[in-house]
A protein has these predicted regions:
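Glycine-rich, N-terminal phosphate-binding loop of Rossmann-like dinucleotide-binding domains
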Residues: 14, 113-114, 239-240
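FAD-site-proximal beta/loop scaffold in flavoenzymes
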Residues: 6, 121, 127-143, 239-289, ...
Length: 309
């Protein structure tokens, strides 16, 4: 596809932030298309159970919630196009997004490309997702109430996850490849005082042990090379996230972690371009915060379009 049609809004990414932006845009009368590589929902679609999104008293699985969001947006005229984005020219007028299915042009662009959790890279990790392997303590911690869990990592996210889990789990084992945490000092004292938090220094996970679910991990000492087995019910991988911002490099301002610099207005360093959800700089990355970003982005985009007619 390569025509001269200009959309009011191009939404890149079909996660909760992207489809909320599309919904609000369509309801505001903006001609809107969502460009998504695979399927709606992003990381949310891989979540087995979501209990912290308002309105679902019994919870809902991520795939079903994603499907509902997509259908709701499309009911108001949003078009969905499944295509891989290959190139973007965000300073062009109109703005240009080249995909595997052709070129799309828009007055504004909402980037909702998300951030993928970095993985352990060990066998069986993907297969055990939702069956003992998790990447979000705030999302899945309550499933491990009274159980033993391992947290892998040594930065702020790992420390925060270990503290959060210490309030619900019977035992938390924090595994770090170095002999001290990289997390800021504010976490050190609370962790050392938590009676149910144990540290395994100079250790990495070399294998996941499982039957139908995770049953434990094998650890390798990075100094001696010795291996040991730790029985546990769950592993929370907290070794950072990788924002999907490769195509924004050289165009938008990014922070040291590769996230798009955008505040609560979701405005980026280029007028008419907005970043929503996990891809932008923010203190909390959850479905509900991504949804809020989507609504704010459209509010700002409407003002931009009105001022640049």
């Amino acid at each position: 596809m390569n025509n001269n049609h200009v959309y009011d809004m191009l939404v890149v990414g079909g996660g909760p932030g992207g489809y909320t932006a599309a919904l609000y845009a369509a309801r505001a009368g903006l001609d809107t298309i969502v460009l998504e590589k695979l399927s709606a929902g992003g990381q949310m679609a891989l979540t087995e159970q979501i209990d912290n999104y308002p309105g679902f008293e019994d919870g809902i699985d991520g795939f079903s919630l994603a499907e509902k969001m997509q259908k709701q947006a499309e009911r108001f005229g949003v078009r969905s196009e499944y295509a891989e984005v290959l190139r973007m020219d965000l300073t062009a007028v109109p703005k240009l997004v080249e995909t595997s299915e052709g070129i799309f042009r828009g007055k504004t662009v909402v980037l909702a490309t998300g951030a993928d959790p970095r993985t352990l890279g060990v066998a069986g990790e993907a297969e055990l997702l939702g069956r003992g392997v998790a990447y979000c303590a705030a999302c899945d911690g309550m499933f491990y109430k009274g159980k033993t869990v391992v947290v892998v990592g040594g930065g702020n996210s790992a420390a925060a996850d270990a503290l959060l889990l210490s309030r619900v789990a019977k035992k938390v084992i924090l595994v770090h490849r170095r002999d001290t945490l990289r997390a800021t000092k504010i976490y050190h004292e609370p962790l050392s005082q938590a009676e149910n938090v144990e540290f395994r220094w100079n250790s990495v996970v070399s294998a996941l042990l499982s039957g139908d679910r995770l049953t434990g991990v094998r650890l390798r000492d990075t100094v001696t090379g010795e291996e040991s087995v730790v029985d546990c019910d769950g592993v929370f991988v907290s070794v950072g996230r990788q924002p999907a911002t490769a195509l924004a490099v050289g165009q938008l301002a990014l922070d040291d972690g590769g996230y798009i610099v955008a505040g609560e207005t979701t405005e980026t360093s280029i007028p008419g371009v907005y970043a929503v959800g996990d891809v932008r700089t923010k203190p909390l990355r959850q479905v509900v915060t991504a949804v809020a970003d989507g609504a704010v982005a459209v509010h700002m985009a409407e003002k931009y379009i009105a001022e640049n007619r």
